Design a protein with these regions (language model features):
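Nucleotidyltransferase catalytic core that binds NTPs
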Residues: 1-130
Length: 130
């Protein structure tokens, strides 16, 4: 789910390049069951990303292996500093990485949880259904 943290990240990344391509994982939960599945279709998410003025193109991928292969065709990769000491797909690819500061507390998982918690009880009582 897009939140202001993503917009800030795209703006920051775009300041380093002329063309910003965003890689969109179709469903991260297929390879990482601990991840929540996307709420919106890949087509809807791609349309939203393309409407952001800092994003020039979006490529989608189903498997981490495909994303790994995409990376070999790009000059620069942008990652949040929260990934610096961890593992991430393509760590072995010889590509320049620009580490973007994540100076916010936004989280897609937290946003999904907040939405769930805000509608759970009213929906159990039958509200929200037309």
């Amino acid at each position: 789910m897009i939140h202001p943290g993503y917009i800030r990240m795209f703006k920051d990344a775009k300041s380093y390049c002329n063309h910003l391509t965003v890689a969109l994982h179709e469903n991260p939960s297929t390879e990482r069951p601990q991840k929540l599945p996307p709420v919106q279709s890949v087509e809807d998410r791609k349309e939203i990303l393309l409407s952001i003025k800092y994003v020039d193109a979006v490529v989608t991928y189903q498997k981490e292996k495909s994303f790994h292969d995409y990376l070999k065709h790009y000059d620069i990769r942008f990652l949040g500093t929260d990934y610096r000491d961890g593992s991430y797909t393509g760590k072995d690819v010889n590509i320049d990485i620009i580490w973007l500061n994540r100076e916010h507390d936004y989280s897609s998982t937290k946003l999904k949880t907040d939405i769930y918690n805000s509608v759970k009880e009213p929906m159990q009582r039958g509200y929200g259904y037309d």
